[in-house]
Amino acid sequence: MLFSPPLQRATLIQRYKRFLADVITPDGTTLTLHCPNTGAMTGCATPGDTVWYSTSENTKRKYPHTWELTETQSGAFICVNTLRANQLTKEAIQENRLPALAGYNILKSEVKYGAERSRIDFMLQADFRPDCYIEVKSVTLAEKENGYFPDAITERGQKHLRELMGVAAAGHRAVVVFAVLHSAITRFSPARHIDIKYAQLLSEAQNKGVEVLAYKAELSAQKMELNEPVPITL
């Protein structure tokens, strides 16, 4: 994924009201950005960090600038736009960069499924193969080289795991993909210290046939690409 037009650089002043952030540009202008991330963003929003933002061509938007990446003062890149996790995963599947998800010729997005009336991020289909249901999660919480999900209690994430267990029980392929969007992370675990129920459900889901995968994105202010498998400890 190439950023076109190129991202612009600023310095973070503060994030507030979850969806807003104030930054100062190199010429001293103060801007308010849209922050497309409802999570705690622990370690991703420290005042003084470098922010890379995109600008919408839609002149009717109240906040036309969107926070895409954080470049921390230690040099790590973090993609804070949670929408990018799905886009990167879709691109990687279509370009056959994820061998575990190769061999399908149809990809559908936002398909309704499950007893709790959810929408799956992606469904893959091919002749003579079970349908493959994929839920994608964005991983940005880092403690040293360890990456964790979630960064706050997620009842929605718990629901998705229950739904995937139902998919597996019905004979389909069920997959959760953790998209690691922090350059300092080298391994992944569920965040038991934040949401013990989610961690327990993830282990249960794996035991009941749900595949748990994690891939890391190469991140820069110019482009992003999801391709590197990451070790998982449940």
Swiss-Prot record:
Q: Does the keyword DNA-binding apply?
A: yes
Which family does this protein fall into? Belongs to the SfsA family.
The protein's name is: Sugar fermentation stimulation protein A
* NCBIfam families to which the protein is assigned, alphabetical: sfsA
Q: Which InterPro entries match?
A: SfsA (IPR005224), SfsA_C (IPR040452), SfsA_N (IPR041465)
Q: Give the matching Pfam families.
A: SfsA, SfsA_N
Q: Which residues bind DNA?
A: 201-220
Record's function text? Binds to DNA non-specifically. Could be a regulatory factor involved in maltose metabolism.
Tell me which domain of life the UniProt entry assigns to the organism this sequence originates from. Bacteria
Q: What keywords are annotated for this sequence in UniProt?
A: DNA-binding
- CDD domains per record: SfsA-like_bacterial
Q: Does the keyword DNA-binding apply?
A: yes
Tell me a Gene Ontology molecular-function term this record carries: DNA binding
